[in-house]
Amino acid sequence: MSEQYILAIDEGTTSTREIIFNYAGQQVASVAREFTQYFPKPGWVEHQAEEIWNAVQITTSTALINSAIRPDQLAVIGITNQRETTVVWDKETGRPIYPAIVWQSRQTSDIAEKLVKDSYSEMIRQKTGLVIAPYFSATKIRWILDHLEGAQERAEKGELLFGTIDTWLVWKLTRGKVHVTDCTNASRTMLFNIHDLTWDQEILDLLKIPRTMLPEVKSNSEVYGETDPYQFFGGRVPIAGMAGDQQAALFGQLAVKPGMVKNTYETGSFIVMNTGEEPIESKNNLLTTIGYKLGDQVNYALEGSVFVAGSAIQWLRDSVKLLNSAPESEQAALESKDANEVYVVPAFTGLGAPYWDSEARGAIFGLTRGSSDKDLIKATLQSLAYQTRDVVDTMQKDSGIEIPVLRVDGGASNNNYLLQFQADLLGKKIERAADLETTGLGAAFLAGLAVGYWQDLDSLKEIAKTGAAFAPKMEEAERDRLYAGWQRAVLATRVFAHGKDF
């Protein structure tokens, strides 16, 4: 029998990547394709779900061709995806009735604000582990049903289906035969009770969302169905592992013990701590969520979501034209002569954890006549580290666990300047994953375990290795001074946006 491989579909916010892994966890092929971002109004972010599906088809076929691997050589497919992004489609035609509303989008702020005003915050936090925010899928579904004529009635008749991107891709791969999600993606909808692991009827009734729209919720590692040959180059391949991108990265880093933490620097930055089999309720605006579910065992997590991280570097490149490429930011930061006096608060779509302020907007502080482009680039890079410290400090306070090491992955973790500054600012060791594509690796691990490609967690430990490590070098007094400046900058940004003090 010829060697078998695993295909991981890593569907992100700005691009789709397909990675083919072998048994040793090595990448045999990796192909990425960007798709269009739509900004119909200020603060709105949308995707075309069919464009995402087309990107998956193109990258899959290219990966298979480049590696000379046939569909029948794929043992299994794993999927990981941008979370919360919401698609509603016609059950019969399979066509979306509205563009996908992206997790970053603020077009549903009014719905979230009304829920807060009507005093539903505590009920929703207790059931879902989440704060009320336009970030999550629930308000996005409600917005679509409100703004498309006849959509509410059609939903009540069972004519419309909802899914996050994982659900949409499984639906397409199986040619409409399977409508499922996994518990990590479900836990990001603001509709899922993370304690009894079911869609919460009280919240569904509150938002008038028919239960018939919602997918069946499965574990992260089981066979959900198989590809339809028409949709997958003539092959029938089991789809058997699925997780939201940040939970997939947690699993890809094998952060499987309570207290283990990872940070993924991508479009946003997402710090996730494994808290074990009991959920920890945050007192400081972190999210209590599901880390992963294997069989009947659920592992919970605390998460701090930063909305703008790598996308701040893209802003420097694409909008203000200070960079030709993102990797140039490292050398620019090293050449900066300023004494870390400039602060960039990249609240382009509001502030995430622990502030949850959707009205805040980006700002720059500390400029002088001598400030240069390199100073601005360095300050933007540093903003990723400052926002991470906001979350790590809060996470330690909520959990009572001192975090000795932060494991990192994602595109921006290639930047050595960023990781050294992160270590300095936290006063903690930073370990970079040897394979930065830990989201795809996590999806592959989950899928492989489901079909016996790998037997158990022990067999994965030789694959998930760490690469370079960064130890803190900064004096504590300097660390505290810099962070105090960041806190003043964030406060000033919020005061400006709201016209009041905090």
Curated annotation (Swiss-Prot):
Residues holding sn-glycerol 3-phosphate: T13, R83, E84, Y135, D245
Protein name: Glycerol kinase
UniProt pathway: Polyol metabolism; glycerol degradation via glycerol kinase pathway; sn-glycerol 3-phosphate from glycerol: step 1/1
Physiological role: Key enzyme in the regulation of glycerol uptake and metabolism. Catalyzes the phosphorylation of glycerol to yield sn-glycerol 3-phosphate.
Subunit comment: Homotetramer and homodimer (in equilibrium).
Binding site for glycerol: R83, E84, Y135, D245, Q246
Source organism of the structure: Lactobacillus delbrueckii subsp. bulgaricus (strain ATCC BAA-365 / Lb-18)
Swiss-Prot/TrEMBL keywords: ATP-binding, Glycerol metabolism, Kinase, Nucleotide-binding, Transferase
